[in-house]
Amino acid sequence: MRIRGVSDFDYLLLLTMLALTSIGILFIYSSGVNSEGHVISREYLKQIVWAVMGVVLMLSVSMYDYHRFKDRTTLIFAGFILLLIYTRLFGRYVNGAKSWIGVGEFGIQISEFAKIAYILYLAHYLVYSQSEPMLKRFAKAGVITLLPMALILSQPDLGTASVYLPIFLVMCFIAGFPLRLIFAVVCVVLLTLLFTLLPLWEQTFLQYQGVATRIADSRMLSLFVFFSLSATSAVAVVGYLLSGRKYYYWITYALGMVSISYGASLLGVRVLKPYQMMRLIIFLNPEVDPLKAGWHIIQSMIAIGSGGAFGMGYLRGPQSHYRFLPQQSTDFIFSILSEEWGFVGGVIVFGLYLLFFLHTLSIMSHVDDLYGKLIASGVLGMFLFHFVVNVGMTMGIMPITGIPLLLLSYGGSSLWTAMIATGLLMSINARQL
């Protein structure tokens, strides 16, 4: 495998990453300035230190042949699973989630770095399992995905756990799985959320107990619905096996998704905390709880709207400096940027991310081996999901899940994860035939 020279180093990816990180540091600093112009937070200094260390990590990974991860991915992935278990048992709580380990003020979020281990291991499995039956291979890939997701969800950290799903879907698409399988997973996830949240939606927005609420409140009714759906699905399976008719297949396909989704929702209402479920629906109308669950979205939309075309000027945003906006250096950093730099600033950030995404697609199109292509697709899925959900959350069109905007939001673990992932892209791009 040929490594190209310094003249062919991926400067475009490096400069894009540095531009986004620099913008992030600017607005982390802005978030730490109060209404009197005094700096009350030193988060920006920590972010600068983490950024410098992250660049070193990124360049180190870029110089390492990504093929050499193949024989080590099982050990790396197993190590992170053990670390996630350790975090669940002995970690410390930060923002309501037991997701950090460390000593004193120094701590790391293992679930962030586990994304990289997961991408490497899933890519390795999908490459070396191509001779296995399709459904068996897809099911095993699903189990590999559910393992870290379940451990992270138990912390409970819904936002970080949810990132693994789009990574899985994008990598399975690149691996060549039929669209019907990928579509089925998407439908099951959406239906599970629907069945889980529908009773709360009735109570919060309609303010009465409808059919969904009455079924959810009765364990007997819930089990009856589940077993009825499962039995009907089983009958459809038997009909398809005996007759071979196509419509039995599609009935089984549809009813199977509904049955699995409803069964998963029965577990979901016991796993998700009440505040997590409220966050998932409050974006539909934050005014129903403007001082609690809806406060973040309302203040974020005010900040973005007040920025106008050119913004109110750097360090001149009242929403952030008067501390109206919670989590403004992390989850809602895009709101500060839009308030102070306006629509133009938002377009600049959008353009930089678009450049990152298109360049990653270009790398994928030129990679000769499936392993490298799968790793790049996993990185793309991770970055794209973070971007869409975080920006959509600040605009009030996506639920609040606590997902940071990679490279911009404050936080060493997420920043290092993003930079290590960028280093993997550089390593792949530098070793094309």
Curated annotation (Swiss-Prot):
- How does the UniProt record describe the way this protein sits in the membrane? Multi-pass membrane protein
Transmembrane ranges, per UniProt, are 9-29, 44-64, 74-94, 100-120, 158-178, 181-201, 221-241, 249-269, 295-315, 341-361, 378-398, 400-420
Q: What class of enzyme is it?
A: transferase
GO CC entries = cell division site; plasma membrane
What GO molecular-function term can you cite, just one? Answer: lipid-linked peptidoglycan transporter activity
* Reaction(s) the record says it catalyses: [GlcNAc-(1->4)-Mur2Ac(oyl-L-Ala-gamma-D-Glu-L-Lys-D-Ala-D-Ala)](n)-di-trans,octa-cis-undecaprenyl diphosphate + beta-D-GlcNAc-(1->4)-Mur2Ac(oyl-L-Ala-gamma-D-Glu-L-Lys-D-Ala-D-Ala)-di-trans,octa-cis-undecaprenyl diphosphate = [GlcNAc-(1->4)-Mur2Ac(oyl-L-Ala-gamma-D-Glu-L-Lys-D-Ala-D-Ala)](n+1)-di-trans,octa-cis-undecaprenyl diphosphate + di-trans,octa-cis-undecaprenyl diphosphate + H(+)
Q: What is its EC number?
A: 2.4.99.28
Q: Which Pfam families match?
A: FTSW_RODA_SPOVE
Q: What's the protein name?
A: Peptidoglycan glycosyltransferase RodA
Naturally occurring in which organism (per UniProt)? Treponema pallidum (strain Nichols)
